[in-house]
Amino acid sequence: MSVAFAAPRQRGKGEITPAAIQKMLDDNNHLIQCIMDSQNKGKTSECSQYQQMLHTNLVYLATIADSNQNMQSLLPAPPTQNMPMGPGGMNQSGPPPPPRSHNMPSDGMVGGGPPAPHMQNQMNGQMPGPNHMPMQGPGPNQLNMTNSSMNMPSSSHGSMGGYNHSVPSSQSMPVQNQMTMSQGQPMGNYGPRPNMNMQPNQGPMMHQQPPSQQYNMPQGGGQHYQGQQPPMGMMGQVNQGNHMMGQRQIPPYRPPQQGPPQQYSGQEDYYGDQYSHGGQGPPEGMNQQYYPDGHNDYGYQQPSYPEQGYDRPYEDSSQHYYEGGNSQYGQQQDAYQGPPPQQGYPPQQQQYPGQQGYPGQQQGYGPSQGGPGPQYPNYPQGQGQQYGGYRPTQPGPPQPPQQRPYGYDQGQYGNYQQ
């Protein structure tokens, strides 16, 4: 065997032709087979000899490929032939793989490599999600694509929730809404983390990118929420279950995010969430806490706001959403009804002052909402109007806290209505 292979190899050196190279590749396949057979039989001496021969052939082919690029064009097809053997041969023939990688790489490495990256991207996007996040930065669209699919998968991963935040890119937002829907549902489990990620990311990313877009989303989305509010309710419920979970769990994040952005992004979700919250039994339960405590919880949470700073954000967020949202909704509803959503927000801020820490956020709301406020009006209008039904109960700004409960009730009812 060694002689047979050696001769062709020597001839190949003299004859750099496609036929000679192809024959050498065939010989390499035979060598790989022989190596595998010898390994299976435990003939280490023969295996080592074959490996050395194979390594020599690969080095020679690599040299030819380097000297003659045309050979590379010829090699790719053959390498694929070698590749099948490659896995066994490469693993088994330690030395050859490097040369092989040199020769084969175009096929094996490249073919394998790129797929791996794609695989990784998908894997990362889906599994790691964090990679997604990086990816997200690079390719929101891809992320959206990935997120769409990833969210679906990620939804299972929940990290996707975080990846919704990847979705959060405003582009994602629509998807996010949808994805959130999908994710939110899956995310419900992961919701907290996703929301944590999402909210932070969304808040930041969306706030950064979409804030308006989110708001646009809200506007569109708000409308979507109005139209989609049921979905939002679902999303909110799902996501917001997550958000709720995420909100409370995320609260730490929110607080950072309490910067209105995330709250906004969150708020969208939170609006949906809160609506969903309302929609969601737990949120309602929590909201119900708000309900029973609702006013108290409002007061409670307001106190707890300081305490629950984060939970406040969420609950506050909820309250922001409810209070803030409701206030925003109620106020914003008022604001929505009245152009003064921001005015509503200032009241919210005023309310928030009671809530403490919100004023800034509320301020964030005021300003951000000022922008989004109009957009939120979509929410409020959609939901606000729904709240509007509730507003009658909320009519007095004094009620904002009540509106908050109403917000919850409304949010919940909003969800129900939605």
Curated annotation (Swiss-Prot):
Compositional bias (Basic and acidic residues): 309-318
Ranges where the record places region 2 X 13 AA imperfect tandem repeats: 344-369
Biased composition (Pro residues): 394-403
Keywords: Acetylation, Activator, Nucleus, Repeat, Transcription, Transcription regulation
Function of the molecule: Appears to function synergistically with RBM14 as a transcriptional coactivator. Component of SWI/SNF chromatin remodeling subcomplex GBAF that carries out key enzymatic activities, changing chromatin structure by altering DNA-histone contacts within a nucleosome in an ATP-dependent manner.
Quaternary structure (record): Interacts with MLLT10. Isoform 1 interacts with RBM14 isoform 1. Isoform 2 interacts with RBM14 isoform 1. Component of the multiprotein chromatin-remodeling complexes SWI/SNF: SWI/SNF-A (BAF), SWI/SNF-B (PBAF) and related complexes. The canonical complex contains a catalytic subunit (either SMARCA4/BRG1/BAF190A or SMARCA2/BRM/BAF190B) and at least SMARCE1, ACTL6A/BAF53, SMARCC1/BAF155, SMARCC2/BAF170, and SMARCB1/SNF5/BAF47. Other subunits specific to each of the complexes may also be present permitting several possible combinations developmentally and tissue specific.
Family under the similarity heading: Belongs to the SS18 family.
The protein's name: Protein SSXT
Encoding gene (name): SS18
